[in-house]
Amino acid sequence: MYAVFQSGGKQHRVAEGHTVRLEKLEVATGDTVEFDQVLLVADGETVHVGAPLVAGGKVVAEVVSHGRAEKVTIVKFRRRKHHDKKMGHRQWFTEVKITAINA
């Protein structure tokens, strides 16, 4: 059984037991979080597609950790002007483990 849900402006395809990195959530480590914006739920033979959400659909997860992703380096420059600018960014994330999918 798998589901597609929306969190942080992104869609994630998950199954029970999967560990997923999401945009940072303000939830303590070890707490349980529920995602009710479920777009699709599928088990072996049936697929429930929401319009836009699946009625009664819920994905339950446990917060494993918080952290920062690898650094992304941005370089801007202007040709022939001896001008360049180098910047970096590390995005915060929350790692969750999917414990249940309800349709």
Curated annotation (Swiss-Prot):
It comes from the Bacteria. GO terms for biological process: translation. GO terms for molecular function: rRNA binding; structural constituent of ribosome. GO terms for cellular component: cytoplasm; ribonucleoprotein complex; ribosome. Signal peptide: none annotated. It holds the Pfam family Ribosomal_L21p. Keywords: Ribonucleoprotein, Ribosomal protein, RNA-binding, rRNA-binding. InterPro entries: bL21-like (IPR028909), bL21-like_sf (IPR036164), Ribosomal_bL21 (IPR001787), Ribosomal_bL21_CS (IPR018258). NCBIfam families: L21 (TIGR00061). Belongs to the bacterial ribosomal protein bL21 family. Part of the 50S ribosomal subunit. Contacts protein L20. PANTHER family: 50S RIBOSOMAL PROTEIN L21, LARGE RIBOSOMAL SUBUNIT PROTEIN BL21M. This protein binds to 23S rRNA in the presence of protein L20. HAMAP family: Ribosomal_bL21. This is Large ribosomal subunit protein bL21. It comes from Shewanella sediminis (strain HAW-EB3).
